[in-house]
Curated annotation (Swiss-Prot):
One matching Pfam family: X
Keyword Zinc among UniProt keywords: no
Biased segments, Low complexity type: 25-48
Processing and modification events after translation: A fraction may be phosphorylated in insect cells and HepG2 cells, a human hepatoblastoma cell line. Phosphorylated in vitro by host protein kinase C or mitogen-activated protein kinase. N-acetylated in insect cells.
One GO BP: viral genome replication
Purpose: Multifunctional protein that plays a role in silencing host antiviral defenses and promoting viral transcription. Does not seem to be essential for HBV infection. May be directly involved in development of cirrhosis and liver cancer (hepatocellular carcinoma). Most of cytosolic activities involve modulation of cytosolic calcium. The effect on apoptosis is controversial depending on the cell types in which the studies have been conducted. May induce apoptosis by localizing in mitochondria and causing loss of mitochondrial membrane potential.
Listed HAMAP family: HBV_X
Protein name: Protein X
Location of region: Mitochondrial targeting sequence: 68-113
Source species: Woodchuck hepatitis B virus (isolate 8) (WHV)
InterPro entries cross-referenced by the UniProt entry: Transactivation_prot_X
Region described as Disordered: 25-52
Signal peptide: none
Family indicated by similarity: Belongs to the orthohepadnavirus protein X family.
Lineage: Viruses, Riboviria, Pararnavirae, Artverviricota, Revtraviricetes
Length: 141
């Protein structure tokens, strides 16, 4: 089942923080799994992460040349959470005229994060529905 998460840029650490979105979204982030849990080592946090785990990583497929897994990143406008758009399709429409998909990573790192810092980011990028991706996570920048 997919989880609805809210994204925030932590400019001090240059990472995206993915927090639960819902009636109590101001509560703590995802708790760390217990030491004896059956979770795979690829999905469990490193010991250096705090107990209030900010999921400051995105799946490695997010910055791949072919784009993220289609079922992983879904954008939704905060005002109309019922109508979601596929992030890959949304991004493809935004990058029309770009010469190649090799610009995917520079676009995310330069354009998207700059807009985020300036506060002029499209509200559809504020919420992602994540689920089903088994790629390892990476740290942006």
């Amino acid at each position: 089942m997919a989880a609805r998460l809210c994204c925030h840029l932590d400019s001090a650490r240059d990472v995206l923080l993915l927090r639960p979105f819902g009636p109590q979204s101001s509560g703590p982030s995802f708790p760390r799994p217990a030491a004896g849990s059956a979770a795979s080592s690829a999905s469990s946090p490193s010991p250096s992460d705090e107990s209030d785990l900010p999921l400051g990583r995105l799946p490695a497929c997010f910055a791949s040349a072919s784009g993220p897994c289609c079922l992983v990143f879904t954008c939704a406008d905060l005002r109309t959470m019922d109508s979601t758009v596929n992030f890959v399709s949304w991004h493809a429409n935004r990058q029309l005229g770009m010469p190649s998909k090799d610009l995917w990573t520079p676009y995310i790192k330069d354009q998207l994060l700059t807009k985020w810092e300036e506060g002029s980011i499209d509200p559809r990028l504020s919420i992602f529905v994540l689920g089903g991706c088994r790629h390892k996570c990476m740290r942006l920048l």
